UniProtKB/Swiss-Prot annotation:
Annotated organism of origin: Apis mellifera
Positions of the Protein kinase domain: 632-894
Example of a GO MF term: protein serine/threonine/tyrosine kinase activity
Coiled coil: 7-37
Binding site for ATP: 638-646, 662
UniProt-recorded name of the protein: Dual serine/threonine and tyrosine protein kinase
Primary location group: cytoplasm
Biological process per Gene Ontology, one example term: positive regulation of ERK1 and ERK2 cascade
Amino acid sequence: MVSKLPQEFRRYLRNRNQLQHVLEETQQALELINLENFFPEENVVEELLSPLTLNRITHILANSPAIIILGQDSKAKAIVVNTLISNDILPVCNGLWRWIRLTYGQTNHISLTLDLEYELVENLQANEKPWSTLPIEDLTKSDNEDITYPTVLEVQLNLPILKDGVQIFIAPNNGAVKVLANEFLSILPIFLYALGEQPLTEQNLEELRDLKETYPFNPVLFISSLENISLNGIDPELTESEQHRLQNRLYTNDSTSSKTDDDSIDFDRMNSLGLSWLDQLTNLGFLGMKESVEVDQLSWLGSGQYISDFVGSCRKTDQILYFIRGCLQTYLINASTYLNEVHTASLRKFILSAFDMARIIQITPKRIQYAQHKENELYANLMKIVHEKQQEITGLIQNIIQEMKNDVLLSNNDVYLYQNTMSNNNQRTEWSATVKAAISEVQRVVLGRLCEKVAKQLVNSVNCLRESFIGTLQRCLLSLEKTYERDTCLLASDALKQILSAAYNVELHNSSPFSIYSFLERLNLIFMSSSLQWSSTHTLDVAWRRKVTIEILNSLSATKLSKIILMQFGDKLESSHDSFQAALRSIENYYSGKLERTEEQRIALRKYHAPRLAKLALESTSMIDVVRYGKPHCAEEIGRGQYGIVFACDGWGGKAGPCAIKSVVPSDESHWNDLAMEFYYNRSIPDHKRIVKLRGSIIDHSYGGGFGFGSAVLLISDRLSRDLYCGIRAGLSWLERIQIALDVLEGIRYLHSQGLVHRDVKLKNVLLDIENRAKLTDFGFCITEVMMLGSIVGTPVHMAPELLSGHYDSSVDVYAFGILFWYLCAGHVRLPYTFEQFHNKELLWTSVKKALMIVGIRPERLPSFDDECWRLMEQCWSGEPSKRPLLGAIVPVLESIQQKAKRSKSLQEVSSDKLQESSTDSRNPALALAEPYNQRGTVVSPPPTKRRTMKVVKYHLFLTNLYIQMREL
C-alpha cells in the first residue's frame, strides 16, 4: 500500500495547480471589477479577498507538503522511515542527529545545506565510499550548530516511492518544533511521530506540548516502532487489578476476535506500554477517548476535521498511507473552501448590487417625475392665490390699517410708534435732521409693522400648501441628491435648495418678516405721489409723530397695496418656478447619463462578471466534492436531453440512497456561464421537500484532456422514480394528479420566495417519488428576476407571450403552470391540437410564435374539463401578465377541486357532483381568481394578505441580449 504514496502526491499536485489557476482567475476578475469602478469608494479586492484570506490560500498553494518524522529517539524514527520507504537507508541506532531530508534523484547523492538554500562545503563520509546506509558521522549534529538556523542533510535517492514530489524530513530530537514554526522549510507538514520502546519521557512530552500549541489544527499519527504492542497473555508488570481486568477482556473477546478488523486497535490486547502511551497522549489532547460503561472499553472521539490517530505497528503501512492521504485532502479542502467563500461572497454582492441597480433604474425617473409634478401643483396653487385672493388681501390690509390706527390712538407713548428715537416727552427736542428725513423714518416704521402683520396672515393662507407639498418635495429631492456629484453640480443643487427655501418655505421672523420688505421700494412710490400737507414745525415730539403716523395710515390705499403685494409675490413665484425647472433639468440630465452607465454596469455584471465568478465557484466547490468523495460511478443511462445525459448511481456524497448524475459538456463560454449560474442558483436554494436536492458537482478534466473547455461537468442530485411525463403516460388517478398540481405550485412558490424564476416548468422537469409526490428539477433556466437579460428561453408550448418581447417577470411560471395543468386535467401527454399537426421542431416553433403573438390561441378545451378547471387554466395563461392570478390565490382553488374529487371515484362523477352542488355553493373558488386582489396588476385594499406587484423593467432594445434557447418537449 505504501507504494501508492507517489500517486497521492501526484494527485495533490494536480489539484493544487488547478486551485492556483482558480486563484489567479479570481484575482484578475476582482481587479477588473475594481478597475471598472462598479462599486465607488470601495476596494473590492480587499473587501472580498481580504489579506488574511489571501495569506491562508497562498500558504497552502505556495508551499509543498512534506512528511515530518518526529519521535522519541533516533532509533524509533529510523525504524519508521526504513519501513515507510522499504529501504534500510538510516542506521537503527540512537544519537544526536541533524535535520535530514529525503527526496527523489536520478542517482543517490548527499549534501549539506543551510536552510535548504546554501550548500555547505564539508567532507561527508558518504561521498568518500559507496553506501547503502547513511554513515552515522554524516547524520550526527555538530556541537557548534545553531538550532535556530539548522543545517539539513539533503539525501537524494533513486527510489520510486519518492517520485512526484514526495519529501520526507527526519527531525532532530531537540528544537524541531521551533524550526518548523519559523517556516524556514516552507512546507505543509504531515506529522508522523515514532514511538520507541519506553513510555514518553518528560522531554518528549514537552516537545509534544509545543507541537500541539504551534499546530493546534494539524493531526499527528503516532506509530509504534515495535512490530506488535499486543499481548497473548497477561503482562506480569501490571498490578493485580489490571491483570484481572485484562484477563476478563481476553476471555470475553476471544470469541469475537476473528470478526475484528485487522486495521483497528485492539485495546483489550494492548500491553502495558501501549496503554501507557495512550494514557499519555490522551492527557496531552492528541487522542480523545472515553470509556464506555456498557462494554467497558475505549472508543475514539472524532471531530469534523481529520484527527490524530494511533497505529500499533509500523508494519501497518496502509493506515499510514490513509493518514497521509487524509492530510493532503485536508489541505486541498481548506484552500478550496477559502476560495469558494470568496466566490460566494462575490456573487452575493453582485446579485444584491444588481437588485439595487434595478431599483435605481426604476425609481429615479419616477422620483424626478414626482418632483416635477408636485412642484407644478404647488406653483399652480400659489398662483391661484395671486389671482383669486386680491379682494381677500385688500380686506385684510384694511383691517390691519384700522388696527394700527387704534393702537396709535390708544398708545400713551411712542414706544410702539418709533423705538429707534430716544426722546423725552416733557421737552421739545429740535431734530438735526430735516422734516423730510423724519417723515421717511416714520414711514419705514409704519410700513414695517404693516408688512409684518400682512405677511403673517399671508403665511397662514398658504400654510396648508407648505405642509402638503414642501416636506414630500424636499425628501424626494434629498434622495435624488444623495448620489449627486458635488464637484460638478454643486451650484445647481444649492440653488435648488435656496429657491425652495426662499420661495416656498415662508418662514417669518421679527427681524425679516417674509420677503415683503422688498416691497418697500414700490410702496414708497405711493407716498411720493401723495401730497401730505403737514406743518413745517421743527418740534418732533410724540404728538407730532402720532399725527404723522395717522396721516400716513390714512393715505395708504389697501387696493394698491394688495396689487403690489400680489404682483411681487407672483413675480417671485414665477422666478422660483423657472429656477426650479432649470435645476430639475440639470438633475435629470445628470441622472440620464448616470442611469445609462448604471444599466451598462448591471448588464456587465449579469452577462460577464457574475457568470465568470460563478464558473470559478463551480470549480472550487467541485474540487471540494471530488477530494472529499471522489468521482461517482456512472451506471446505466436513464435519460437524455438537449444539453446532457443523465446516468444512474447507487450512492455518492456520504449519503445513502440512489442518485442521478447529469453529465454536461459545455460547448462554449456562454454554455459554461449558463451552467455555472444554474449550479450556483441550485446550490443556493435551501432544502425544500418540493425541490430536488443537488448533492454536489464534479468537473472531469480528463474528459477533454485539458482545463476548462472540453471538460465534463457532473451534477449529482437525488434520484426519483420517474418524471411526470412518464407518470401521466403510465396512468395516474385524478386525485394523484391534483396532488401533483399542488406540489408543483408549492415548489414554484418557494422558488419565487427566494427571488428565483424557473422559466422552464414542464412535464419532464417535474419528478415523482414512489408515492407520486412531485418535486421540481432542472434549473438550467432558473435565475433571479433581477438578473434576467430578456432571453427567450424555455419549451415552446409552455412559453408565455411576453417571452418573445424579452420583457417578462415571474408570471411566466404561472403561464407554464397553466399549460402543465392542462396536461394534468387531460390525463395524457399528447400535444394540444393547435400544435399537434406540426411534425418537426421548426414548424412547431413557428406555430408557437404565431400562437403567442395572436391573443387567445391556447390549448383547446377537452370534453372532460369541467368549468372550474378550465377557468383556472384560462386565468393562468392570460395574455396580460397582470391578469394572471397570484400563486397563493390558486392554492384554495386546487384544494377545493381536490376536496370534491375525494368524494367521487372518477372525473365524470366530479362533474355530476358540481351540477348538484352549484345551487348550494355560495361562491365558486375559481371565480375568486378574477377578483382584483388575486391578480398581479391591480392594487386594492380588501384582502388582509396581498402581494406587492412585481414591476416590469423596460430596457432599450439595443441594451438587451435577445437570443433564443429552445428545449425539446
